Design a protein with these regions (language model features):
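Periplasmic OmpA-like peptidoglycan-binding domain that tethers envelope proteins to the cell wall
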Residues: 392, 397-399, 596-694
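Structured interaction patches on ligand/partner-binding surfaces of diverse proteins
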Residues: 521-546
Length: 694
């Protein structure tokens, strides 16, 4: 995250009381005087020699400390950390506690800017242990623990700091972020995240940007050893970043990255880019380096011609040579440039601003307090005219820079949301880019012990709600080719044809009311209604359609009568209500309601009883809105014994399929099987006798 390090040069500067030339002159003068003393005072005691040696060491140590301060002021954090570490190790633990505390704090500041949160935490702990007086060390320790994901320890440290500084907004938001992270631990996420190994090296690789009609190109910055030149950065200890790119082949596979062609890359840092809508102009961040001045960054442009990029041209945001300007992001319509700056007029740290690319006069706009904080708000990505993604360490988050999504509700008013894990982590997460769908790439230094940034891919897995089912006939045999239609109150309409086994599957929306209708040639339609849950989790539903045959009688299960009576019992209501639904779903059907008895009793008695029972069913249907013209009651007594179907055979394996349960056959059975056969013969069923009712 080199450019974030550069753009933070002017925040929390460390003390530097002596210019470099003065420090070096003093050191040289002191060394000369020491030689004179040694030549003219050979007879003095060893005590004086030792005293002078100690003084010499102290003077050189002070010189090193001044060098480290100058390195830090120039943003050379890596070099400064090496120098501070040498000074720290030369200081005695007991006799020089204040000095060790001060140097430990400055060393921690280097590690903080190098994203080495573990080392930073250790350094700040040492500063506090050696009684460094500035409570800022406690705040920075809390932030380092926060970035390590040590939320419980970070909470305690934030609370200690807030006891001394109760109104510090960064500490308050940090404390809130830690508590929220603890509460959300283990909450499932719909995002999948994987390291983009093809784009990553053993150094830092960051800020990917997808481009192309099919998002088949990706540009990113890298400090790989393949970057231009041999110079190592004093800021990071790595090579300065160059811009690389990769393309997909005909199979849709990413190819090995290469440096962009042309004059764009130099020995200085280049990276964090965005493109004009036509793709011919690149806006990118470039380091500015002047002798004896802090490294800063500016926005440059380059144009493409024949796949090569032109020499960079500085894009002058405003006439300001003291502020930093970087992280450009062009709006999809090409009208605006979003960028990051520490210029005056912000809310502290780095702020996100916007300027018109069409009419620049009077169009400079700070995005306001919904986006910008007292911390650093960086890496804007404009996905649409009203949706902005950015990273911030000032809003409550999981640690370091966290990714946020913001929807515009006014010029400077936004509704923002913190993106969930695993998009965010306790480390720095930034530089997100999207393809057309909810997938893309971003940058994170999670799990890297050196704090190096790497590119990760992500994909949002939508909530999957399905309904599966089967269509059978009354004998539980599948009805292949049955047509199932489903209509939702969200306007969705779907149609499926049942497979050979009668099964089907639909994908549903969340919290939608549906009506389903199943039908097939030779069968009556059946309709069912249900509502899917508005759940954030995957869900599966199951439904069964049992289609009555038009050509064969359909038994109505669970119709009960009292012994020797025709009155319907209460247990029969559910089955009869299902029949009412079938008749309402098939309004042109006329049916015969038939009742059958077992072999017991005379034919005349059974004929009368069965007819009265059939009429009881018809009367119930009429009472519940079915026209009498669509119903016919018929009693058959014991004259039509049941023929064993596949379903009956599955329930009663002792009866072979196709067997007629006649009185003669039943009498040949055991007593137990006779009772089972009599139960099968006692039934109420209906048959379709017309399809022309109007």
């Amino acid at each position: 995250m080199i450019f974030d390090k550069i753009t933070n040069l002017f925040h929390n500067p460390q003390t530097n009381n002596a210019p470099k030339s003065t420090v070096h002159n003093n050191c040289r003068i002191f060394a000369f005087n020491l030689k004179g003393l040694q030549s003219n005072m050979m007879k003095h005691s060893l005590y004086i020699c030792l005293l002078m040696a100690v003084m010499a060491m102290a003077g050189c140590r002070q010189a090193k400390l001044s060098v480290a301060d100058e390195q830090f002021a120039r943003g050379e954090y890596y070099d400064a950390s090496v120098t501070y570490k040498k000074v720290y190790n030369q200081l005695k633990k007991k006799e020089q506690r204040p000095e060790r505390g001060m140097v430990a704090f400055r060393l921690g500041n280097c590690y903080k800017r190098l994203n080495m949160s573990v080392r930073a935490a250790n350094a700040y702990q040492n500063a506090i242990r050696y009684e460094y007086p500035d409570s800022t060390a406690m705040l920075y320790l809390a932030q380092a623990l926060h970035a390590e994901g040590k939320y419980t320890q970070a909470v305690a440290t934030y609370e200690q700091y807030l006891a001394l500084n109760p109104r510090d907004s960064l500490a308050l938001r940090g404390l809130e972020g830690c508590r929220t992270s603890i509460a959300n631990k283990g909450v499932p996420s719909r995002y999948e995240v994987h390291a983009a190994k093809l784009f990553n090296t053993r150094r830092s690789d960051f800020c990917p940007m997808l481009w192309g009609d099919d998002y088949d190109q990706i540009y990113f910055a890298s400090t790989t050893e393949k970057a231009t030149g041999d110079r190592k950065s004093e800021i990071t200890g790595m090579k300065n970043a160059d811009i690389f790119f990769s393309k997909k082949n005909e199979k849709g596979e990413w190819q090995r990255p290469e440096a962009v062609e042309g004059e764009l890359n130099t020995e200085l840092d280049e990276g964090i880019m965005s493109f004009s809508p036509d793709g011919n102009t690149m806006y990118f961040t470039k380091a500015r380096r002047e002798l004896d001045s802090p490294t800063s960054v500016e926005i440059y442009t380059s144009t493409r011609s024949d796949a090569k990029w032109s020499a960079p041209v500085k894009y002058e945001v405003i006439a300001d040579t003291l502020s930093t300007f970087g992280h450009p992001a062009v709006s999809p319509d090409g009208n605006y440039l979003y960028f990051v700056s520490d210029m005056p007029g912000g809310y502290g740290g780095n702020d996100i601003w916007r300027i018109s690319l069409k009419d620049r006069v009077g169009t400079l706009l700070n995005l306001g307090p919904d986006i910008n904080t007292a911390g650093n708000d960086d890496f804007p990505y404009v996905r649409s005219d009203s949706v902005l993604y950015f990273s911030s360490d000032g809003h409550p988050g999981m640690g370091g820079l966290d990714l946020f999504r913001a929807v515009k509700t006014g010029d400077t008013s936004w509704r923002k949301e913190h993106l969930p894990a695993p998009l965010n982590s306790s480390g720095d997460d930034f530089g997100i880019t999207f393809a057309a769908t909810e997938e893309g790439f971003f940058t994170s230094n999670r799990n890297d012990p050196k704090g190096y940034d790497h590119i990760y891919s992500f994909k949002y897995i939508p909530v999957k709600i399905t309904i599966s089912g089967i269509v059978t006939d009354k004998d539980e045999e599948p009805v292949p080719g049955a047509v199932i239609r489903i209509v939702g109150n969200d306007g969705s309409i779907q149609k499926e044809v049942a497979r050979d086994d009668g099964s089907f599957t639909f994908t549903l929306g969340r919290g939608v009311k549906y009506a389903m209708l199943a039908g097939a040639k030779g069968y009556l339609n059946q309709k069912q209604e249900f509502e899917s849950d508005n759940t954030p989790e995957d869900a599966e539903y199951w439904v069964e359609f049992v289609l009555p045959s038009i050509t064969n009688p359909s038994v109505i299960e669970n119709i009960f009568y009292d012994f020797d009576k025709a009155d319907l019992r209460e247990e029969s209501v559910e089955a009869l209500n299902s029949l009412i639904t079938v008749l309402n779903d098939n309004p042109h059907v006329v049916i015969e309601m038939a009742s059958h008895t077992d072999r017991w009793g005379s034919e005349a008695y059974n004929m009368s009883l069965s007819h009265r029972r059939a009429q009881s069913v018809v009367d119930y249907l009429i009472a519940h809105g079915i026209s009498a013209d669509r119903l016919k009651a018929q009693g058959y007594g014991k004259s039509q014994p049941k023929t064993v179907t596949k379903r009956i055979n599955r329930l009663y394996p002792q009866f072979e399929e196709g067997t007629v349960l006649s009185e003669e056959y039943v009498l040949s059975l055991s007593e137990a099987d006779q009772e089972a056969a009599d139960q099968i013969n006692r039934r109420t069923e209906f048959s379709v006798i017309s399809l022309d009712y109007e």
